[in-house]
Amino acid sequence: MAIRKYKPTTPGRRASSVSMFSEITRSTPEKSLLRPLSKTGGRNSHGHITTRHRGGGHKRRYRVIDFRRNDKDGVLAKVAHIEYDPNRTANIALLHYFDGEKRYIIAPKGLTQGTVVESGANADIKVGNNLPLRNIPTGTTIHNVELKPGAGAKLARSAGSSVQLLGKEGPYAILRMPSTEIRRVDIRCRATVGEVGNADQINIRWGKAGRMRWKGWRPTVRGVVMNPVDHPHGGGEGKTSGGRHPVSPWGQKEGRTRRPKRYSDDMIVRRRRANKNKKR
């Protein structure tokens, strides 16, 4: 994916860049695979904010993605189109199965219009094919990996991400995650060969606040500039530093959010490397 830089005709354009969408072959989605998508503004069913800084944004329709592919084993499918999906960073591929059904999948790097893909234990090891981990050779780069057999892909679904199959030990496969964490996964889980496409998406510069508003992101306001009624760090005479350890607007101490002693931690072989550049 190529990135186009704008000429500095305005302050907002000066720092902006945009995808060239060179891989996209069709601009209109498959109507039968669209669903309505209502906005929540970051609120739950009680109206309470559960995700801050969300709201507004362009209207979207959800594209139904097939993250399982286990009910199409042995049925060949042809890639009809590569399409843009506003709901994720990766592009999506429209498959026309030879039995007449149409489905979307995450578009891996190198998958082009007209390519024939397959799923099942006997599928070839080529980009876009979906197989159980026990049938994939060690060292293969994969994406769209399941955590539980038949539950659908959960790992390595965003643009440019991938997982490496390091080995197999009994009923488990050893995987290296995008975070460098090494963990065990049930060998019956399925994965797709290759890495997710659209890897240059991370290099796009949005350039101005307005483009983030189009995406549904609202401004992030620091607690120390709020009033005491709005945030524990608010108030004070003049400019202050907050006067306490960093907390959320609801008083929750800032820091690690990963749940300790989670049942799936038993499957971790080696923790991810710490980010040395991150503030302590």
From Swiss-Prot:
PROSITE patterns (alphabetical): RIBOSOMAL_L2 (PS00467)
GO cellular component, one term: large ribosomal subunit
Annotated region described as Disordered, given as residue ranges: 1-20, 29-58, 225-280
Residue ranges with Basic and acidic residues bias: 253-269
SMART domains reported in the protein's UniProt record: Ribosomal_L2 (SM01383), Ribosomal_L2_C (SM01382)
Keyword set, alphabetical order: Ribonucleoprotein, Ribosomal protein, RNA-binding, rRNA-binding
Segments forming a coiled coil: none
One GO process term, biological-process aspect: cytoplasmic translation
Stored InterPro entries: NA-bd_OB-fold, Rib_uL2_dom2, Ribosomal_uL2, Ribosomal_uL2_bac/org-type, Ribosomal_uL2_C, Ribosomal_uL2_CS, Ribosomal_uL2_dom3, Ribosomal_uL2_RNA-bd_dom
GO molecular function: rRNA binding; structural constituent of ribosome; transferase activity
Compositionally biased region (Basic residues): 45-58, 270-280
Family stated for the protein in its record: Belongs to the universal ribosomal protein uL2 family.
Quaternary structure annotation from Swiss-Prot or TrEMBL: Part of the 50S ribosomal subunit. Forms a bridge to the 30S subunit in the 70S ribosome.
Cited PANTHER family: LARGE RIBOSOMAL SUBUNIT PROTEIN UL2M, RIBOSOMAL PROTEIN L2
Purpose: One of the primary rRNA binding proteins. Required for association of the 30S and 50S subunits to form the 70S ribosome, for tRNA binding and peptide bond formation. It has been suggested to have peptidyltransferase activity; this is somewhat controversial. Makes several contacts with the 16S rRNA in the 70S ribosome.
Protein name stated in the entry: Large ribosomal subunit protein uL2
Organism the protein comes from: Corynebacterium efficiens (strain DSM 44549 / YS-314 / AJ 12310 / JCM 11189 / NBRC 100395)
